[in-house]
């Protein structure tokens, strides 16, 4: 639950790897929803320079308005808003927002929000989860939570994205490449030897010698 909550709301959701939609096996949805709500309610909004703050403000007024438009879209398209929305805090704050009954065709499930918004989606099985997770224009990062290592590796190999974290969130290292598929990046990668190779060109030289 801690990883699930932080993966959606770290930095106020203003994070290119945020898990803004979370696909949960149908028998676990009710329990997961209750536990995630309890955790998110404990988040403290406030000054990002205050060590006790969990969620700061949106970066600009325009960005706050854009995130609020996604929240309104979720409500209009039939998702159930369990908590969140606009904040009475002075400045560009948005309360951490959680939706239930999110479906794949909704705007909040198809587009990147870059705000403190989490959509909970119910799936029948891993195959449906893989299909829904793959049906997006983006492909930077995904997270898989499971006790079945074979299923974890199958999902990690199958998901069309540059990084997959298993039972954690956004693990990374300066030595490992980071970048996305589809609209989440180019052929280039940050970090690792691949970050250097994008600035290099390869050359093949054939030399005919007298002894050959």
Q: How should each PLM-predicted stretch be described?
A:
Residues 1-103, 132, 166, 211:
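ALDH superfamily catalytic-core signature
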